[in-house]
Amino acid sequence: KSPESAKELVTKGSELSLRMLSFPQPIIIACSGHAIAKGAFLLLSSDYRIGVEGDFKIGLNEVMIGMTMHHAGIAIAKSRLSEVYLNRSVNNAEIFNSKQAIAAGFLDQIVPESQLMETAVKVAEMSSKLNKKAHAATKLKVRKPHLDTLKKAIELDLLSEISIDS
């Protein structure tokens, strides 16, 4: 694929993350297995992330495959990952199992696979009891600095070349 198509893909993915992070209602993800690259960014862009127990791979592999991490990716990672894991994840492309992914900040909870959907429904029911206006306003207030940074990062990525060294 061309650098232009890579830039378009990165931009669309970053804009999706921006929409998810600012979405007025809670976004709950039930992750039933691996979450690499954009899959991991989807986890980082959600409000509550439930994974399953097991030897699943979760993380940002961009540097490992020869892609210099884009500005928006760094902004998303900085806003959600534990500081201790940020460099390990972004700079070193370290991939985590489900349990490690909680400590890193990719997941909030892990459950046996047989309980994944039941747990997601319970979290959704809990979230449905939130006052919608208060939740949306609070989410935007908490995330404002990160959302502003992400918007600027997306603009910067549009002006930059995507660096992929295969």
Task: For the regions a language model picked out, list residue spans one by one.
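Hydrophobic/aromatic residues within transmembrane alpha-helices
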Residues: 42-44, 101, 120
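Glycine-rich beta-to-alpha active-site loop
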Residues: 16-65
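Well-ordered beta-strand positions
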Residues: 48, 88, 92-94, 109
